[in-house]
Regions:
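Terminal amphipathic alpha-helical/low-complexity segments used for targeting or macromolecular assembly
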Residues: 1-99, 160, 165, 171-172, ...
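Structural signal for interior beta-strand "rungs" in well-ordered beta-sheet cores
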Residues: 38, 95-305
Length: 345
């Protein structure tokens, strides 16, 4: 593809050789003379001057460099679109593999691809163009809209409801029993039935080995456009809003509430029954044990305001030095007081 064609498809301003052929996309340090790269983070701006890439996707006001530039707002999103032009994932034609087990009562929309050893239980309803790769299991009564894409070994449990264009990655489990137990009179833990399904909105992505547990009563809800990273745990009865990001190893205890457009960075944890407002940001490894108002960024464990946390961390790093200074001051004060006592005597 010529650069001029790529610029037209992206709606970018091209500065450089319009006839240059490009064959793919790569990171800024790895890109070669026929590949496109991007700069979205200012820390990588210097690398744009030395890159071997054919062209660099940059912001409109980016300084001139020797490589051709494609100038566009949000170069990172433009990079994503460019990847889609050059990388085509495997295609899965409609059809049912002979080893698949499909209950006669299941209703499957047109254009579905049902892979090897897929199991579809009674009463399942799938919209058009579902793709179920090998060993996917759909429990009785689950429902999904159009364009469900379930990768190998994904599981959706009984009664769960999925919207349109939902993607379930390898090993993810939607609707497993929540962690609910009560002690009986003998002091033994007894399982509490987990009767409530999971509901995923449109365009939800649940990545590899993540778990969204079913509710004790009611339902566990994930809003439209929310993305759930690998190894995330969403506890029973939790509610997550729309267009929220739950990054790797985030854990939500039961009945957590997370608003729209929130970002929970890696390994952040939220205690049960806490509410996080719209637009909240939890930085990596934050531990939240209380409600967080909309728009707040918090850090640390226990989590508190990010700006205060940064100051506290800076102070924490100085504690050994400050302890030595305090020790010296205490010794000087003690010596001064001893001398004063002698004079008074």
């Amino acid at each position: 593809m010529k650069l001029i064609e790529l610029a037209a498809r992206l709606g970018a301003e091209l500065r450089g050789d319009a006839e240059l052929e490009v064959t793919g996309v790569q990171g800024i340090e790895e890109a070669g003379p026929t590949e496109v790269t991007f700069v979205a983070n200012p820390r990588y701006a210097a690398l744009a001057r030395t890159t071997k890439a054919a062209a660099v996707l940059v912001e409109p006001d980016f300084p001139e460099i020797s490589a051709a530039t494609l100038r566009i707002r949000n170069p990172y999103h433009a990079f994503s679109r460019t990847l889609g032009l050059f990388y085509q994932p495997p295609a899965y034609p409609p059809g049912v593999h002979p080893t698949a087990m499909i209950d006669p009562s299941a209703v499957i929309g047109e254009g579905a691809h049902i892979g090897a050893y897929v199991v579809i239980g009674p009463g399942v309803r799938l919209g058009m163009r579902a793709t179920l790769l090998p060993h996917v299991v759909l429990y009785p009564g689950m429902q999904a809209g159009s364009h469900l894409f379930a990768h190998a070994h994904a599981v959706v449990r009984e009664g769960c409801v999925l919207g349109d264009h939902v993607t379930i990655e390898n090993g993810a489990i939607i609707g497993a029993d929540g962690f609910g137990f009560s002690k009986n009179e003998a002091g033994q833990w007894e399982k509490i039935p987990q009767s409530g399904p999971v509901r995923l909105g449109d365009r939800v992505d649940v990545q590899a080995n993540a778990c969204v547990d079913r509710a004790t009563v009611g339902q566990t809800e994930i809003g439209a456009g929310t993305k759930i990273d690998n190894l995330v745990q969403v506890g029973h009865g939790s509610r997550v809003g729309s267009d929220t990001l739950l990054c790797a190893q985030v854990g939500l205890a039961g009945s957590s509430v997370v608003g729209d457009r929130a970002i929970l960075a890696g390994q952040a944890g939220v205690a049960g029954h806490c509410t996080l407002g719209d637009g909240v940001i939890l930085t990596a490894q934050s531990g939240v044990s209380h409600d967080v108002p909309a728009g707040k960024m918090v850090s640390g464990s226990p989590a508190f305001d990010n700006r205060l946390w940064l100051r506290a961390v800076a102070l924490f790093q100085r504690l050994p030095e400050l302890a030595k200074r305090l020790d010296r001051l205490e010794k000087r004060l003690a010596a001064s007081e001893a001398a004063s006592d002698k004079e008074q005597a």
